[in-house]
Amino acid sequence: MKPDRGPRGKQSQAELMMMTVADVIKQLVEAHEQGKDVNLNKLKTKTSAKYGLSAQPRLVDIIAAVPPQYRKILVPKLKAKPIRTASGIAVVAVMCKPHRCPHINFTGNICVYCPGGPDSDFEYSTQSYTGYEPTSMRAIRARYDPYLQTRHRVEQLKQLGHSVDKVEFIVMGGTFMALSEDYRDFFIRNLHDALSGHTSNSVSEAVRYSERSNTKCVGITIETRPDYCLKRHLSDMLSYGCTRLEIGVQSVYEDVARDTNRGHTVKAVCESFHMAKDAGFKVVSHMMPDLPNVGLERDTEQFIEFFENPAFRPDGMKLYPTLVIRGTGLYELWKTGRYRSYSPSTLVDLVARILALVPPWTRVYRVQRDIPMPLVSSGVEHGNLRELALARMKDLGTECRDVRTREVGIQEIHHKVRPYQVELIRRDYVANGGWETFLSYEDPEQDILIGLLRLRKCSEQSFRPELKGGVSIVRELHVYGSVVPISSRDPSKFQHQGFGMLLMEEAERIAREEHGSCKIAVISGVGTRNYYRKLGYELEGPYMVKKLD
């Protein structure tokens, strides 16, 4: 077969593509040396036209072709979707196999708004997912194999120019803790093995090897329900190396939980928050405005209650406005006119009000689901709801002061601002029967957050033996800013600048002098245990612990 002759005489399309990529890199290097900013898309279009190419070179090809001596300079500029690792870690979402919702046994049906699952129109999808979200599609391609899902996603992020030294897993796909113990162990074992390259026979062995892996697992997040967040579940999750829970709350109203067929009470939510925080977990809740029989006023009221009532007060929130999807009970209500979604402008208004209520110690992880618009019959009409809500807040003169909005990495990407004068700020509050202290390094003038630490004086009811009898626990330590490989120090990035150590010293002082604790514990991701060993901590059960003299 003859090679495809391009318009430049004898070269094939592949050769022209190589010349285009080389030219793009050459121009990028020149622009860097002259200190100029370059619009990459314009540059690709112009260079492709110059060589008569029908298609532009892919970003992955350009990143792969950057010479070694320029990689440090150019790859950060070429990085696709820099937000992916702006918070300091690469997040890898994996899905467990499709299984039925556990509360079908005693409520007779799934939640009224819930799509997906083995009995739905989307039969190969997990419960509450349609199978068309990016994560679901990756999981289906890998046939829900945890090892393959992890390897493929890590490789993909690498090719896009991200540093994958630190990985955080999110285990999605319905109630993971409702699956059999054998399957759960197999799943978690494979996640750790995919990073360490070892083949383990048990979870404890996988965790041991994962501690020493080059790609560190800095945390695992598991999605669960309040009734699958009891003491035995929490202990299992600690043994997996899990550090954060995503608990489906959806509404703080008892009547709404009953009408939507949740299968648990609001009291169960408060109890699971209490137990989870006393075991050291970070608690992220899923909330759904616009559910049936609520209305705008009650929706606003429930978020005031949610952030101000000490029985709730989560560390993070995912805000999922209700969507009407074919095949759900809600779809039938909508079709017969018994349910109506808010209009787009009302929804933007409501989300703007909710974001204004968020306290500075809570992080809003997501606003709206990742479900493709063609599958949505009614509900959110915009793909960029958070941006629209933030713009509406600007008009109203309010601001969103949650953790994510103020992070140094995100501020740099969106507003090109860097912190100038950094100081330690302390906020104390009471939540779920314990005394919480939120320590952070911030630039108060520009309202930028560099690092944070969550410290808790455990309540008397803590069920873990390691945390009984006057123990303080560090539930989270995180320095923001783009991922910096663990072995290197980059003076322009904020990770590995010693902020973490300063925050830990202050936490130890508060635990000793104010809490009157005899020891301090840290719930640490498997891959970060060595960091705490350097600070004088040692492993006791699943926690890193240090005696306070």
Swiss-Prot record:
Domain Radical SAM core: 84-374
Domain N-acetyltransferase: from-to ranges: 398-549
UniProt-annotated binding residues for [4Fe-4S] cluster: 101, 111, 114
Any one of the GO BP annotations: protein stabilization
Main subcellular location: cytoplasm
GO MF term list: 4 iron, 4 sulfur cluster binding; metal ion binding; phosphorylase kinase regulator activity; tRNA binding; tRNA uridine(34) acetyltransferase activity
Catalytic activity: uridine(34) in tRNA + acetyl-CoA + S-adenosyl-L-methionine + H2O = 5-(carboxymethyl)uridine(34) in tRNA + 5'-deoxyadenosine + L-methionine + CoA + 2 H(+)
Cofactor-binding details, from the entry: Binds 1 [4Fe-4S] cluster. The cluster is coordinated with 3 cysteines and an exchangeable S-adenosyl-L-methionine.
Enzyme class: transferase
Segments forming a coiled coil: none
Cofactor(s) demanded: [4Fe-4S] cluster
EC number: 2.3.1.311
Protein's pathway: tRNA modification; 5-methoxycarbonylmethyl-2-thiouridine-tRNA biosynthesis
Compartments it resides in: Cytoplasm; Nucleus
Pfam families, sorted: ELP3_N, Radical_SAM, Radical_SAM_C
Residues involved in acetyl-CoA binding: 166, 476-479, 499-501, 532
Record SUPFAM superfamilies: Acyl-CoA N-acyltransferases (Nat), Radical SAM enzymes
One GO CC term, this protein: nucleus
Gene3D superfamilies listed in its UniProt record: 3.40.630.30
Keywords: 4Fe-4S, Acyltransferase, Cytoplasm, Iron, Iron-sulfur, Metal-binding, Nucleus, RNA-binding, S-adenosyl-L-methionine, Transferase, tRNA processing, tRNA-binding
Family (UniProt): Belongs to the ELP3 family.
Self-association state and partner proteins as the record states: Component of the elongator complex. Interacts with transcriptional repressors snai1 and snai2; interaction with snai1 inhibits its ubiquitination and stabilizes it.
Protein purpose: Catalytic tRNA acetyltransferase subunit of the elongator complex which is required for multiple tRNA modifications, including mcm5U (5-methoxycarbonylmethyl uridine), mcm5s2U (5-methoxycarbonylmethyl-2-thiouridine), and ncm5U (5-carbamoylmethyl uridine). In the elongator complex, acts as a tRNA uridine(34) acetyltransferase by mediating formation of carboxymethyluridine in the wobble base at position 34 in tRNAs. Stabilizes transcriptional repressor snai1 by inhibiting its ubiquitination which promotes neural crest cell migration.
Database matches in PANTHER family: ELONGATOR COMPLEX PROTEIN 3, HISTONE ACETYLTRANSFERASE-RELATED
Protein name per the record: Elongator complex protein 3
Organism annotation: Xenopus tropicalis (Western clawed frog)
Species lineage: Eukaryota, Metazoa, Chordata, Craniata, Vertebrata
